């Protein structure tokens, strides 16, 4: 049986977060326009600025649940494209999106992904992954950078020539070192801070374009 959450059962910080969330214009907009999360508008702004995803492309979305980025990618690639959404968490089905549940680091999951690709070249890897935060920045920051490194390693394995990469990164310890890894792997690096990113958030999005022939 569902339990009703009352203000009395929430901490002061949780109540503040809930008020901010419910009042967030991007949350309201996502609900109105049918997106699964406000994060959709981050990718939409990046797409509007850089025109990364095009009809017929093959896209892999890491840490895809609940699926807002995959929603956008599926619409952009169209019927001739392919979007593979991967997450260790379950995700409700989406039209024009193939969902693969599991840890993409595991050989069995990676092999399933290759089977889905069936020889297709991956044009872009997108990642909005973030760890479950503890509130301790000394713990959360390295965890998030680690996820970024996993996403980059995956991209290096699957991207075709001139492939592209979009990844969410928290600014802080390890950011500069990770940024250099992306610089070493792509011809062009751009940094985006979409309007849908909350002002207090340390997140930015690194956009790598033109996968280098010899990845570092």
From Swiss-Prot:
Pfam families: FtsJ. It catalyses: uridine(2552) in 23S rRNA + S-adenosyl-L-methionine = 2'-O-methyluridine(2552) in 23S rRNA + S-adenosyl-L-homocysteine + H(+). Specifically methylates the uridine in position 2552 of 23S rRNA at the 2'-O position of the ribose in the fully assembled 50S ribosomal subunit. Belongs to the class I-like SAM-binding methyltransferase superfamily. RNA methyltransferase RlmE family. One of its GO terms (molecular function) is rRNA (uridine-2'-O-)-methyltransferase activity. Gene3D superfamilies: Vaccinia Virus protein VP39 (3.40.50.150). GO terms for cellular component: cytoplasm. Keywords: Cytoplasm, Methyltransferase, rRNA processing, S-adenosyl-L-methionine, Transferase. NCBIfam families: PRK11188.1. S-adenosyl-L-methionine binds at residues 67, 69, 87, 103, 128. Its main location: cytoplasm. The active site is at 168 (proton acceptor). This is Ribosomal RNA large subunit methyltransferase E. It is found in: Cytoplasm. Its EC number is 2.1.1.166. It comes from the Bacteria.
């Amino acid at each position: 049986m569902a339990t009703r959450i009352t203000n009395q059962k929430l901490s002061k910080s949780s109540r503040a977060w809930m008020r901010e969330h419910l009042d967030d214009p991007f949350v309201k907009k996502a609900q109105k326009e049918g997106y699964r999360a406000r994060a959709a508008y981050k990718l939409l702004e990046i797409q509007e600025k850089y025109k990364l995803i095009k009809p017929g492309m093959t896209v892999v979305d890491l840490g895809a649940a609940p699926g807002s980025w995959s929603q956008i990618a599926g619409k952009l690639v169209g019927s001739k494209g392919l979007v593979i959404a991967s997450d260790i968490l379950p995700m409700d089905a989406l039209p024009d999106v193939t969902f693969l549940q599991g840890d993409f680091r595991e050989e069995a999951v990676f092999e399933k992904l290759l089977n889905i690709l069936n020889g297709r070249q991956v044009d872009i890897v997108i990642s909005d992954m973030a760890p479950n935060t503890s509130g301790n920045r000394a713990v959360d920051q390295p965890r998030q950078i680690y996820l970024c490194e996993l996403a980059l390693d995956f991209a290096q394995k699957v991207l075709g020539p001139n492939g592209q990469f979009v990844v969410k990164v928290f600014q802080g310890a390890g950011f500069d070192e990770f940024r250099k890894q992306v610089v070493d792997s792509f011809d062009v690096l751009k940094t985006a801070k979409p309007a849908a990113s909350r002002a207090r958030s340390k997140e930015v999005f690194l956009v790598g374009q033109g996968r280098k022939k010899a990845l570092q």
